[in-house]
Each structure stands twice: as C-alpha cells, then as structure tokens.
Amino acid sequence: AASDVYKRQAGETAQCAKIFGVDPKVAFLSYSTLGSGKGEDVDKMRNAAAKAKAKYPDLPIEGELQFDAAVSPRVARTKCPGNPVAGHANTFIFPEISAGNIGYKIAQRLGNFEAYGPILLGLNAPINDLSRGCNAAEVYSMAIITAALA
C-alpha cells in the first residue's frame, strides 16, 4: 500500500537527515491539516503518518499537515496548538514525487536555497541524481553526499 511506502520513506529520510546533522521532525504534507480536509489523498498521508509513528516511536512525526502549519510556529498555534512537530518540521514527506520536485525547485529558485538531489534512499548502495539545471558546485556537493552515504 502507498501508506507503507511513505512510512518507509519517513524512516529513511529521517536517517539521512541525521547523517547531515539535522535532528529530524517529520511532517507528512497534504492540503489538509489534521483532518481539516477530506479525501483519498488526505487519508493516504494521515494513514502513512500513523504507521510511521507506530514504526518509529522515538521519531517526532506528524501528519497530515499543510506546509504552512508544518513550518510556521504562528500558523501551527492557530491550526494545531500544542503539536510538537507542527511549526518546527524540518523533514518533509511529500504526497508524490511531482509535489516534492516542485517544492524543492521553488525553495531553490525563489528562496535562494542550495538544493541537492534527488537523494535516492532505500537502495543497496548510495545512488543519487542531478537536475539538468544544476551547476558545478552542486555536482561536487552531490559527489560528497553520495560518499557520505556509502
């Protein structure tokens, strides 16, 4: 089931975040925050978050969350007060690859963030990819990241 794939991705992504010195707070992203919306896509992310919480009980995980509730403490106080992940998430599970790709390209181009990846997880060996729009520094950094994952 899709929720099992996302559950596994949460654990692998959190482990990768730890390799880079990030204390992961995982948000399963959606167009809904903790039941504010309805639909199959919401259910998929909510179920995946519940399975991930059960599988990784020591990992801060929440979902489903809208991106603003995941990263903004002010929005989180309104939409899900007292939630330990909401407003502080730093590790994101997107509902599909196209949404993840759009999100990272927006952060890179409008937010002027450095973007690396995609970083492919769950394989027998570290294998990564590069965007055709990357520069030489990003190629170098991906080589370092791939070596760190080996």
Model-derived features: where do they sit?
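Short, small-residue-biased leader/transition segments that mark boundaries at the very start
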Residues: 1-6
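An alpha-beta-alpha
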Residues: 10-27, 34-40
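Gly/Ser/Thr-rich active-site loops/lids in small-molecule metabolic enzymes
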Residues: 11-17, 41-64, 111-126
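Internal helix-turn-beta structural module
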Residues: 19, 83-84, 99, 104-150
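Short acidic (Asp/Glu) and glycine-rich catalytic loops that position anionic groups and cofactors
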Residues: 24-31, 119-123
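Active-site rim loops that border cofactor/substrate pockets in soluble metabolic enzymes
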Residues: 31-91
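Short glycine-rich anion-binding loops that position phosphate/pyrophosphate groups of nucleotides
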Residues: 34, 97-100
